[in-house]
Amino acid sequence: MFFAVITLFPEMFEAITAYGISGRAAKRDIVQVTCINPRDFAEGNYRRVDERPFGGGPGMVMMAEPLAKAINHAKQLASQAGCVHVPVVYMSPQGKTLNEQAVQQFVDYDGLIVLCGRYEGVDERLIQHYVDQEWSIGDYVLSGGELPAMVLLDSIIRRLPNVMSDEQSAIQDSFVDGLLDCPQYTKPDQFEGLDVPEILKSGHHANIEKWRFLQRYQRTLERRPELIEKVALTKQQKKWLSDEQG
């Protein structure tokens, strides 16, 4: 999958390309992550990419022209890589909140061009002409779009085929089927007086599966009750709940 990131701080994305699951995916050429600095497309000796906002106010606004040139360059790179469906995504507090359903849709794209804002944001005309989607990672403000962009890339990359060493691990993550994940345990059997639930050591896979589902359901009910209404339970899961409640 192809990713082009428009950012004033390309070095930050070594966290994606050099470490962990996403780093291994990059080394195996499952993903291609290219960072494009809009300063390279700015004019003048100082390569300015920001100016004061019309109408006054604090801070600076990223200028449309260097960003547009950077996006067009990213589109050329995507085309050269054989990618057809490559939306331009702007990471913004005004965007829709990123969730697992959106991530799974991104996986079907050939790639993404991700625009990272800075300062007070970017010129609205750039958004109107070049941005296909705006996404947020939550109702809070960060110094720029780089960290949200890394969240987006990491969440997509780990969903791609052949990236995870254990595909089942990705399937069982929180939110994949609408429920939170179940409690996890590893050695030793006892830690500070707390024991691993005996059922997890029983070797009875059907009982373990049932226990994990019930734990996930109860945890979601307690911590994120608004998610329960959207969960599509299987026939077996409904039976487990009925047995437990009745």
From Swiss-Prot:
One of its GO terms (cellular component) is cytosol. SUPFAM superfamilies: alpha/beta knot. It is an enzyme of class 2 (transferase). Transmembrane segments: none annotated. Keywords: Cytoplasm, Methyltransferase, S-adenosyl-L-methionine, Transferase, tRNA processing. It catalyses: guanosine(37) in tRNA + S-adenosyl-L-methionine = N(1)-methylguanosine(37) in tRNA + S-adenosyl-L-homocysteine + H(+). GO terms for biological process: tRNA N1-guanine methylation. It comes from the Bacteria. GO terms for molecular function: tRNA (guanine(37)-N1)-methyltransferase activity. Homodimer. Specifically methylates guanosine-37 in various tRNAs. This is tRNA (guanine-N(1)-)-methyltransferase.
